């Protein structure tokens, strides 16, 4: 996993890893979730990948659009 940039500070996301149609996020509490083409869907995954690479807006996007619609809790 690579560290999430968190350019504005205060994000709950600390790290991410992504592939062609998925992204895995680790949060400050250690919880790790996988999001994919099934949950929450390809459009959301693509946007989450874009925001993760940019290092800003990911936590806000999750709270506003994705919430608990993840594919799996990994840790």
Regions found by a protein language model. Give the residues of each.
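A charge-rich, low-complexity, intrinsically flexible signal that marks solvent-exposed coils, linkers
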Residues: 1-75
